[in-house]
Regions:
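Sequence/fold signature of self-assembling virion shell proteins
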Residues: 173-265
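Assembly/oligomerization interface modules of large self-assembling protein complexes
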Residues: 1-76
């Protein structure tokens, strides 16, 4: 018998291995329900400046309000069906590998949901500002610098890129720094000359990069942790486990994320 707690623990382990969500989310909120309403506050301008206040004068206020539209939470999951013979005669280590892979697939789907919100917003008219390179199929270092500079007053400390954009970036002369190469070979982690952590993911469309300030860009809303429902079909000698998790994403500050697209060649 595959115990539900063993299944849930193995799936969670797979979700945590190589999970990029902690690198792009500013906060995690646990919420019981299917619809969630986040908060908003305008960044920049007079509403955020700490100006000098004369004696007896009113202190400028920053107003935090709930968003106009709800954030919808989605259920992601997989049904695991195992025969009596598979459970009876195989080692648990083999099942752990399969369960970790299921967890990895769920994590990829959650990342795809996060990318969708970063690019198009969460339904509250907060899609990311987008820019495009001048040359077709070409990404220059000057364009990366301009993209980085557009984040003020935020800081671009994380850069999500598709595989083809990563290849274009690695071929730039500015990325040939020996220390950058040594760090990449030793740890597998690559930092850009602009100081942002570079994360490659297959869930991004081709020719796309998303820059963000991970401190202010995205909120992860968890409706439930990994849940396992277990039963048996005695007449067929099958054991089944439904593995599900409910979560969604809310965009906190619109200016904390931007999209850079390499013009199609």
């Amino acid at each position: 018998m595959l115990f539900p707690e063993y299944i849930a623990r193995s799936v969670r382990q797979g979700m945590e291995e190589g999970d990029l969500l902690p690198s792009i989310t500013a906060a995690t909120t646990r919420f019981e329900g299917m619809d969630y309403r986040s908060i908003t506050a305008q960044a920049g301008g007079d509403s955020k400046e700490l100006k000098a206040v004369d004696e007896g004068a009113s202190i400028p206020a920053t107003t935090i309000q709930v968003q106009a539209n709800l954030v919808k939470l989605r259920k992601r999951g997989r049904m695991l069906v195992a025969s009596y013979e598979a459970v009876r005669y195989q080692k648990l280590d083999l099942f752990s590998v399969t369960l970790r892979q299921i967890g990895s697939h769920i994590a990829q789907m959650l990342l795809a949901d996060a990318v969708e919100v970063l690019i198009h917003g969460d339904g509250n008219d907060n899609a990311a500002a987008a820019s495009e390179t001048k040359g077709a199929g070409v990404l220059t270092y000057d364009e990366l610098v301009d993209f980085w500079a557009a984040f003020d007053p935020y800081e671009m400390n994380t850069l999500l890129v598709s595989s083809d954009v990563l290849l274009k970036m690695l071929k730039l002369a500015e990325f040939q720094n020996p220390l950058t190469g040594l760090n990449f070979q030793g740890t597998g982690k690559l930092s850009t000359p602009l100081g942002a952590t570079l994360l490659r993911t297959s869930v991004l469309p081709k020719n796309t990069a998303i820059g963000l300030d991970k401190r202010y860009a995205l909120e992860l809303v968890q409706g439930s942790d990994v849940t396992v429902e277990y039963d048996k079909l005695i007449d067929r000698q099958l054991e089944r486990a439904a593995i599900t998790t409910i979560s969604g994403f809310a965009k906190l500050f619109q200016g904390a994320s931007r999209v850079l697209t390499v013009k199609a060649s």
